[in-house]
């Protein structure tokens, strides 16, 4: 049973108006166990995977160490993305996500890819972990590239091979 409870501690725009909780058939809220040692502690509900904190609040957006991350660089430091505040299901497959890249190099004016505020595509494996550092990742028969933070490389990319002139 899903229950939405007003967030009485909301103090900034990153906080949700309501927190979602899930109560199992035993009447207890799903919570992250104190012994959870991995980045996220997953619970499957109606075929979708969710993560909750120690208080039972459904986590959403970028999540690391069992907690929601709201810093502008969360997309760089986190491996898992759990939808928005009303559907915190773990993302698997393609997802376009709005990010803020404070280290962008604005070399192309009026280009969305080179703007600090960006909508970028990410690929999340079946484990929910984002794909990173891959130039020739085969997904559904097509090849894609991803940078060290998991953004799909949206520009033209040419792989260069060097030959040592002394070996010919």
Predicted regions located by residue number:
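Extracellular adhesion/carbohydrate-binding repeat motifs centered on closely spaced tryptophans
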Residues: 1-168
